[in-house]
């Protein structure tokens, strides 16, 4: 298995798909990285030469990925919570912050239902 940006990349997948194993790289960015590095999108990772891998590493290194990106996202959410703005309050309460309804649904953010004694 090859390592790029501290992540083990699966050998049996095509380069375009395998790069999406890195946090912060989706299909579109993976396509652009492959094109910029001059690596075919449909070439399996195990078939790439060392020079191809080095070019991929260089291209991935130009983006904020993995730990740095996770840290940045966490800091952005923490900043919102410290400001006390509406989005920060919603994050603090564990509720959706993009305007979705919460009377019904929103179970993913709110967690499992809490039983209320005396109901029924």
UniProtKB/Swiss-Prot annotation:
The keyword Ribonucleoprotein applies. Keywords: Ribonucleoprotein, Ribosomal protein, RNA-binding, rRNA-binding, tRNA-binding. One of its GO terms (biological process) is translation. GO terms for cellular component: cytosol; small ribosomal subunit. SUPFAM superfamilies: S13-like H2TH domain. InterPro entries: Rbsml_uS13_C (IPR027437), Ribosomal_uS13 (IPR001892), Ribosomal_uS13-like_H2TH (IPR010979), Ribosomal_uS13_bac-type (IPR019980), Ribosomal_uS13_CS (IPR018269). GO terms for molecular function: rRNA binding; structural constituent of ribosome; tRNA binding. PROSITE patterns: RIBOSOMAL_S13_1, RIBOSOMAL_S13_2. Residues 96-120 are annotated as: Disordered. Part of the 30S ribosomal subunit. Forms a loose heterodimer with protein S19. Forms two bridges to the 50S subunit in the 70S ribosome. Belongs to the universal ribosomal protein uS13 family. Located at the top of the head of the 30S subunit, it contacts several helices of the 16S rRNA. In the 70S ribosome it contacts the 23S rRNA (bridge B1a) and protein L5 of the 50S subunit (bridge B1b), connecting the 2 subunits; these bridges are implicated in subunit movement. Contacts the tRNAs in the A and P-sites. NCBIfam families: uS13_bact (TIGR03631). This is Small ribosomal subunit protein uS13.
